[in-house]
Amino acid sequence: MPTAAPVVLPTRTRVLDAAVGLFGTRGYEATSLDQVAEASGVRKQTVLYHFGDKEGLLGAVIDRSAAELAIALERGLSRPGLEGWARVEAVVRATFKLAAHRPALLGLVREVSRLGGPPAARLTAVLEPLVHRATAFLDVEMAAGRIRTQDPRLVLLAAYTTVIGAATEVEVLRALGYPPTPRSVILRRTELLSFLRQALC
């Protein structure tokens, strides 16, 4: 029986995948275009042809990664029939699921936030519509008494920082030679949910 031919991803996709992995685990400044080219199986000139320079590559990586993160968070926010804490929990679970399947992606989000300046502004611009939705949701839930009344944007910032930090901690441990087990990830998520529930409800 003939075997199926391996799927060959488009060059641009391969370069973006490699860049997400390297920027998200090693850091942007510590990664060269030569390393990205080697990891994606192309020449450096090919990377430059598609993205112009390293900053252009970072911009494309941010756009794609932010869109992927937004889709994952949207799934949690848009689940029907959920209100109050149940919807917050759904968003946290969606984030941890993304971290399990695409750990370098959340590492990249953290790296872009660390870089600040134009890269962080670009990430914020892509996520801003989702931030508005989440803030409006918190306003409604606080008015209904299902979530403790606080400044919704500060709550969102604290929750975002806590969840992204906890989710990317998995990749940090893996890089240090302590690969997480499914049980340890579930335990970390459970602890985080308990912490957030005490802070919000």
Language-model region placement:
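C-terminal peripheral helix-coil segments that are non-catalytic and often amphipathic
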Residues: 1-2, 97, 101, 131-144, ...
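Generic hydrophobic, amphipathic alpha-helix propensity
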Residues: 11-19, 36, 61-69, 73, ...
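Helix-turn-helix
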Residues: 14, 18, 22-56, 60
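Conserved hydrophobic residue
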Residues: 28-29, 118, 147
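Hydrophobic/aromatic residues within well-ordered alpha-helical segments
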Residues: 54, 61, 65, 69, ...
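Hydrophobic alpha-helical connector segments
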Residues: 60, 74-104, 152-159, 186-189
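All-alpha amphipathic helical-bundle segments outside canonical DNA-binding/catalytic cores
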Residues: 86-89, 121-126, 142-160
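Amphipathic alpha-helical segments used for helix-helix packing
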Residues: 86-87, 99-121, 169-175
